[in-house]
Amino acid sequence: TEDCFPEWSPTDGVTGNWNSQYDSISVSNATHVWIDHNRFADLRTRDEMQPTYFGHRYQVHDGLLDITNESDLVTVSWNQFASHDKTMLIGSSDSAPEDREHLRVTLHHNLFDGVGQRAPRVRYGKVHVYNNVYRADKNTNYRSSWGAGTESQIYAENNFFNAGDIPPS
């Protein structure tokens, strides 16, 4: 999924940023959802292939999978997420308290291969993350796997991390 007309936001961060609009899958105001046996990746227009404008790489992708707006009882299983930066967002924003008591999500048996961050990034949710594989190498712009934000809970167990040839920092 790519946004042909991303927006430049000069007040996003210290020096501005590009923001894209479209996710590969958006789960919004939904309950009892099962996302199973899919492959999500940026193959045709990978981030590192984009030109630089205003000192930042042109960003034509948003999330691969976002679960927002009071969605609840969502299972994400046996999927592959590959070659992407901002992978998965669970929760709308820090200023969306209506997400409280919702966003109960389970992630299991997924492969996160060459993703940069947000696997997942959680706000207000209660997320069980187990038996997933996280793989990165020196070509991955890896920042973090899990992000626990406002009033979130992440229960993680039996996940495997392979940093390949990334030197320890």
Predicted region positions:
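Short acidic (Asp/Glu) patches
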Residues: N17-Q21
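Extracellular low-complexity, O-glycosylation-prone Ser/Thr/Pro/Gly-rich "stalks"
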Residues: I166-S169
